[in-house]
Design a protein with these regions (language model features):
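Catalytic cores of NTP-dependent nucleotidyl/adenyl transfer enzymes across multiple folds
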Residues: 111-184
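Short histidine-centered catalytic/ligand-binding loop motif
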Residues: 2-8, 52-53, 121-125
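Active-site nucleotide-donor binding segment shared across nucleotidyl transfer reactions
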Residues: 21-62
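Conserved catalytic core of two-metal-ion nucleotidyltransferases
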Residues: 73-112
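Helical scaffold of the NTase/Pol beta-like nucleotidyltransferase catalytic core
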Residues: 1-33, 162, 173
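A short, surface-exposed helix-loop junction/capping segment
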Residues: 1-4, 44-47, 145
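Short glycine-aromatic motifs
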Residues: 29-30, 72-74
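Short amphipathic alpha-helices in soluble, non-transmembrane regions
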Residues: 63-71
């Protein structure tokens, strides 16, 4: 099965990955966020940990890139998404953790639209059971349509889920804005 039942192991796996990445980026100013479906409690998902490394100043990117290369990643460009750089494992095992836990690693500046999209959709799905359940149902339906084929599933998801994600992002923006307004 392409979609797996939720497990708290995904949160633990993120923490293990974060620990190893932190070792490679020691002395650099950044944040690490667990994003994507595996970051949302009780959301069934493909068992792939999605991670965003976030930096404030442009000068930090080169340092982050060098640190990631030292711990066995290679730079894979932005893959067509502005202000979201992709890093992949190079096959040289320096640490078992980074090679044994399947993950996607992105590096984004704080002002990245891709980062905003990741964080807002994650937060909304974490806080709204109805949206989580609807999204989960879509994922199962698409996996079935794709005959459990990963590549076809990704294509179908891109075509069929963006409208839903866009709508929950707008709802989360309104929620975030109203919370900020009520504090002032």
């Amino acid at each position: 099965m392409l979609i797996k039942k939720y497990t708290s192991d995904w949160i633990k796996n993120f923490e293990y990955l974060k620990l190893e990445i932190d070792k490679g980026l020691s002395g650099i100013d950044y944040l690490i966020e667990h994003i994507g479906s595996t970051s949302i409690t009780n959301l069934d998902s493909k068992p792939i940990i999605d991670i965003d490394i976030i930096y404030e100043n442009e000068s930090e990117f080169g340092k982050i890139k060098s640190g990631l290369i030292k711990i066995g990643y290679y730079y894979n460009g932005n893959q067509g998404v502005e202000k979201r750089d992709v890093f992949k494992r190079n096959g040289i095992s320096i640490t078992g953790t980074l090679d044994s836990i399947i993950h996607h690693l992105y590096v984004c500046p704080r002002n990245s639209k891709a980062l905003e999209r990741h964080i807002l959709s994650r937060n909304f799905l974490r806080n709204n059971d109805w949206a989580r359940l609807e999204y989960q149902e879509m994922k199962y339906e698409l996996a079935e349509k794709a005959n459990q084929n990963k590549k076809l599933y990704a294509e179908l998801k891109e075509l069929n889920v963006n409208e839903f994600i866009d709508s929950i992002i707008e709802k989360e923006k309104r929620t975030t804005t109203s919370k900020k307004t009520s504090k002032t």
